[in-house]
UniProtKB/Swiss-Prot annotation:
Protein name per Swiss-Prot or TrEMBL: Probable WRKY transcription factor 10
Family that this chain belongs to: Belongs to the WRKY group I family.
Source superkingdom: Eukaryota
PANTHER family in the cross-refs: WRKY TRANSCRIPTION FACTOR 10-RELATED, WRKY TRANSCRIPTION FACTOR PROTEIN 1-RELATED
Subcellular localization: Nucleus
Molecular function via GO: DNA-binding transcription factor activity; metal ion binding; sequence-specific DNA binding
Cited Pfam families: WRKY
Portion annotated as DNA-binding: 301-366
Binding site for Zn(2+): C332, C337, H361, H363
Keyword Nucleus: yes
C-alpha cells in the first residue's frame, strides 16, 4: 500500500494545473505533428518546463511531509522515469522536453486506482487499447516457460495478464480414510440329496434357516388354528348347522398351498411337497413336538356322515377345488377334545365317502343312543289307566272294570269269523247297544249343571277317557259279529 499511496500522491501533483489539455486535444496535436506542425511547444513552452523534477519535488516537499504526518508514515518519492506512459515516451522520442503532465487514456478514472489492489508497476507491459471494435477472432498468444504475456479477452478492451504464483506444496496425509472392500458371498440355499437325512446328529450346532422358518410357520398355524377352533365353538353354538365362516376354516388343500408358498419364499427351487413334508417331520421329531395326527378313511355309504361311535357337531360346509361335492366340517362335542373331521363324497365315485380325522380323541366313546319307541309306548299305555284311576278316586267314583283279554284267533268260531256283508242276515244290535252302554261309567245328573250361583264354588265334572269305551265297543262287535274295524 505504500507504493500505491506514493504513486497516487505523485500523480495527483501533476494533475494540479487546470489548463492541462484533454486527451482529444493531445491526439489532435499528434496528428498536426505528423503534418509538420508542433503545437505542443506552443502550449508547453520550453522555458517554463524544467528538465529535472528535483526542483519541483523540492518545492512540494512540504505537502508530502504534511500528508506523511497525517497518515502516519513517510512516503517515498515517485520515480517518473520508470513509470512513464506511452504518450510520455512518444513525446520524448519526438524531442519534446519532459512534461509534468501525465497522459491518461480515455475512460480512465482516478477512482480506479483506489479500488485496484495492484498499481501499474511497469507501463511497458500494458498494451494500449485499440480504437477498433473486437469483431474479429482472438489472437492466440503462446506462453513459454516463465514468461507471462498479456492476452486480450473476448469483448473486453482491458488486457488480462496472468501471473505465476508460487503456492506452497500441499502436505500429503497418509491417514486418509479409504473405503475397504468386503467380499459378500451370494446366498445359495443348500439342497441335500434325497437319500441323505436332514439332521445328521444332535451334536450339530447349526441348523438350516429355511427349515427352521417352516417349522415356526407350521407351529404358528397349528396354534392359530386351535384358537380359531375355540372361537368357532362359541360362535356357532346357537347358529344353524349350514352356516359357517370360510375365513376360519382351513382345509387340507389350502394348507398345502400355503406351505408351498412359504417354502418358495425361502428356497427358489423347493423340493417336492411329499419330500418336504418328510424332511419337516424329521426336523420336528429331532427338535420339537409333531403336529396333530391325521387319519383318512374311505368307505361306501349312503349316509353323508356315517356313525363312528362319537358325537359330532357340524360347524361348516363348502365346496373345495377339484370336487363338485361339498365338504362338511365337524368337531367333537366333548369340551376337552379338539378332534375335528371333514366328510366329503368322492369326486369320481359318489358312493364313496372320504372321512379325514385331525387328532386323536382323549376320552372314551359315549354310550350309543337306542331307539326307545316301544318302551315309550308301553310306559304311555301304563300311565293312562293309572291317571284315570287317580282321577276317579279323587271324584269318589269306582274305577272302570278292566276289559277281558282278547282271545287268540284260533278260538274264533266259523260263524264269528265270517265276513260282514250286506247280503248277510240282519243282525240284532240291541245287545251290542246295551252292552256298550253298560260299559260306560255312571255319571250323576245335577240340576242346573250349567249354571252357578254367586256364592257357590265351581265344581269340576271330570269326564272319563273315551278310549276305553271305544275299545270295549269294538271288542264286542268283533266277538259277536266278527266285525273288524
Amino acid at each position: 500500500m505504500s507504493d500505491f499511496d506514493e504513486n497516487f500522491i505523485e500523480m495527483t501533483s501533476y494533475w494540479a494545473p487546470p489548463s492541462s489539455p484533454s486527451p482529444r486535444t493531445i491526439l489532435a496535436m499528434l496528428e498536426q505533428t505528423d503534418n509538420g506542425l508542433n503545437p505542443i511547444s506552443e502550449i508547453f513552452p520550453q522555458e517554463s518546463l524544467p528538465r529535472d523534477h528535483t526542483d519541483q519535488s523540492g518545492q512540494r516537499s512540504g505537502l508530502r511531509e504534511r500528508l506523511a504526518a497525517r497518515v502516519g508514515f513517510n512516503l517515498p518519492t515517485l520515480n517518473t522515469e520508470e513509470n512513464m506512459s506511452p504518450l510520455d515516451a512518444f513525446f520524448r522520442s519526438s524531442n519534446v522536453p519532459n512534461s509534468p503532465v501525465v497522459a491518461i487514456s480515455p475512460g480512465f478514472s482516478p477512482s480506479a486506482l483506489l479500488h485496484t489492489p495492484n498499481m501499474v508497476s511497469d507501463s511497458s507491459q500494458i498494451i494500449p487499447p485499440s480504437s477498433a471494435t473486437n469483431y474479429g477472432p482472438l489472437e492466440m498468444v503462446e506462453t513459454s516457460g516463465e514468461d507471462n504475456a498479456a492476452m486480450m479477452m473476448f469483448n473486453n478492451d482491458l488486457p488480462y495478464q496472468p501471473y505465476n504464483v508460487d503456492l506452497p506444496s500441499l502436505e500429503v496425509f497418509d491417514d486418509i480414510a479409504t473405503e475397504e472392500s468386503f467380499y459378500i458371498p451370494s446366498y445359495e440355499p443348500h439342497v441335500d440329496p434325497i437319500g441323505t437325512p436332514l439332521v445328521t446328529s444332535f451334536e450339530s450346532e447349526l441348523v438350516d434357516d429355511a427349515h427352521t422358518d417352516i417349522i415356526s410357520i407350521e407351529d404358528s398355524e397349528s396354534e392359530d388354528g386351535n384358537k380359531d377352533d375355540d372361537d368357532e365353538d362359541f360362535q356357532y353354538e346357537d347358529e344353524d348347522e349350514d352356516q359357517y365362516d370360510q375365513d376360519q376354516d382351513v382345509d387340507e388343500d389350502e394348507e398345502e398351498e400355503k406351505d408351498e408358498d412359504n417354502v418358495a419364499l425361502d428356497d427358489p427351487q423347493p423340493p417336492p411337497p411329499k419330500r418336504r413334508r418328510y424332511e419337516v417331520s424329521n426336523m420336528i421329531g429331532a427338535t420339537r413336538t409333531s403336529k396333530t395326527q391325521r387319519i383318512i378313511l374311505q368307505m361306501e355309504s349312503d349316509e353323508d356322515n356315517p356313525n363312528d361311535g362319537y358325537r359330532w357337531r357340524k360347524y361348516g360346509q363348502k365346496v373345495v377345488k377339484g370336487n363338485p361335492n361339498p365338504r362338511s366340517y365337524f368337531k367333537c362335542t366333548n369340551i376337552e377334545c379338539r378332534v375335528k373331521k371333514h366328510v366329503e363324497r368322492g369326486a369320481d365315485n359318489i358312493k364313496l365317502v372320504v372321512t379325514t380325522y385331525d387328532g386323536i380323541h382323549n376320552h372314551p366313546s359315549p354310550p350309543a343312543r337306542r331307539s326307545n319307541s316301544s318302551s315309550r309306548n308301553r310306559s304311555a299305555g301304563a300311565t293312562i289307566p293309572q291317571n284315570q284311576n287317580d282321577r276317579t278316586s279323587r271324584l269318589g267314583r269306582a274305577p272302570p272294570t278292566p276289559t277281558p283279554p282278547t282271545p287268540p284267533p284260533s278260538s274264533y268260531t266259523p260263524e264269528e269269523m265270517r265276513p260282514f256283508s250286506s247280503l248277510a242276515t240282519e243282525i240284532d244290535l240291541t245287545e251290542v247297544y246295551m252292552t256298550g252302554i253298560s260299559m260306560l261309567p255312571n255319571i250323576p245328573v245335577y240340576e242346573n249343571s250349567g249354571f252357578m250361583y254367586q256364592n257357590d264354588e265351581p265344581t269340576m265334572n271330570a269326564m272319563p277317557d273315551g278310549s276305553d269305551v271305544y275299545d270295549g265297543i269294538m271288542e264286542r262287535l268283533y266277538f259277536k259279529f266278527g266285525v273288524d274295524m
